[in-house]
């Protein structure tokens, strides 16, 4: 009887030990996303003011983030710990400044320090292609997550919000007043993206799993990415 109790006790310890090992092996090397505010509240409720000051984010190592500037006066991007603000200067020019002293009505950010590099197949050309490919490649991965694309584009369309001061917003059409589009051609770029199947209307649009911001290699152009024609790019996914 005593021997049976000892054997049962040992078996319990083995099971607990195995569970502990499995928990450790399943632990991800990258942190959860941080989500502040919501796109739908900006578009439909007119919540344009600051929900987060970017300089309040303390851990800037491997930091990535995207969102609009407060009161929809520009676009924001954090790329590997560097923060950029883009603003409209004319219908064909913009001003891109590197600074953390800014804020956003909604923003998504994460720290990623290790990446898995994947050569994109030549069949992946558009934003929808990227979305589908990323979804398929990460079906067993921890979600949501940040990712990036680096390489050359044949064409791209980006926009910068430029809402007139004092404008009241209660619909997407009103929110996009002053939005200015910029066409890019044959540029080397980085695209920072965030993927989720569960945050439509929060940090992705209602018809997409991804939200993307693009910055050119020379850091002279940056904005929200609307259209894309890839020449040759590599995909970077957070390394488990």
For the regions a protein language model found, what residue spans apply to each?
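Contiguous hydrophobic, core-forming segments of folded domains
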Residues: 85-145
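Short, hydrophobic/π-rich interface segment
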Residues: 164-216
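C-terminal motif of bacterial Sec signal peptides marking the signal peptidase cleavage site
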Residues: 15-17
């Amino acid at each position: 009887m005593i021997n049976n109790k000892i054997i049962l006790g040992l078996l319990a310890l083995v099971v607990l030990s195995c569970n502990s090992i499995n928990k450790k092996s399943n632990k991800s090397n990258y942190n959860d996303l941080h989500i502040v505010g919501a796109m739908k509240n900006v578009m439909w409720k007119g919540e344009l003011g600051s929900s987060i000051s970017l300089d309040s984010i303390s851990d800037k190592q491997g930091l990535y983030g995207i969102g609009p500037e407060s009161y929809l006066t520009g676009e924001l991007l954090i790329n590997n710990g560097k923060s950029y603000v883009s603003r409209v200067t004319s219908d064909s020019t913009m001003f891109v400044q590197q600074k953390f002293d800014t804020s956003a009505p909604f923003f998504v950010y994460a720290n990623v320090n290790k990446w898995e590099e994947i050569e994109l197949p030549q069949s992946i050309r558009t934003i929808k292609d990227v979305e589908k490919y990323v979804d398929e490649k990460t079906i067993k991965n921890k979600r949501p997550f940040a990712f990036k694309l680096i390489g050359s584009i044949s064409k791209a369309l980006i926009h910068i919000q430029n809402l007139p001061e004092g404008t009241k917003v209660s619909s997407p059409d009103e929110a996009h007043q002053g939005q200015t589009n910029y066409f890019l051609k044959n540029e080397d770029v980085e695209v920072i993206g965030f993927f989720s199947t569960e945050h439509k209307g929060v940090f992705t649009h209602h018809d997409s799993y991804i939200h993307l911001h693009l910055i050119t290699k020379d850091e002279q152009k940056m904005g929200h990415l609307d259209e894309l024609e890839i020449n040759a790019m590599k995909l970077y996914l957070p390394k488990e």
